[in-house]
Amino acid sequence: MKDLLLIITTGNENPEMARFALTGALRQAKSGRYNNVKVLFYGPSEKFIGNSDESTENTLKELVSLNTVDSACIAIAKFYGVEKKLTDMGIELAPFGERLASYIEKEFQVITF
């Protein structure tokens, strides 16, 4: 089995796709198809989840509780002013490039939404 990294960048420009990405991440995390499923948030997705509705928040809480969410980019979270909201949801903030490099080094399969 492979390890899977989902990079979610889609945000308010396509909220339906952003919700699909979150739901897909949750389903993959629960499926047992992979050794490990991790999610990185980057760009507009951070603004989307930082201002999310109750349904989206519930999906995020479940992803966090499954230890699926690795982090969101600290620089982007600051840019959008959502760092407190993200950390309150249990999402760690870290430099995106460093986190991505660590998963590439570990040979995770990468899918971007």
Give short role names for the model-derived ranges.
Residues 25, 36-43, 70-76:
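Short internal beta-strands
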Residues 5-19, 44-52:
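Short, glycine-rich nucleotide/cofactor-binding loops
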Residues 62-63, 80, 87-101:
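A short aromatic-anchored loop/beta-hairpin motif
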Residues 28-29, 33, 39-52:
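N-terminal beta1-alpha1-beta2 submodule of the flavodoxin-like/Rossmannoid cofactor-binding fold
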Residues 105-112:
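C-terminal binding/interaction regions
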Residues 17-31:
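Histidine-anchored nucleotide/phosphate-binding helix
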Residues 53-83:
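A glycine-rich helix N-cap at a beta->alpha junction
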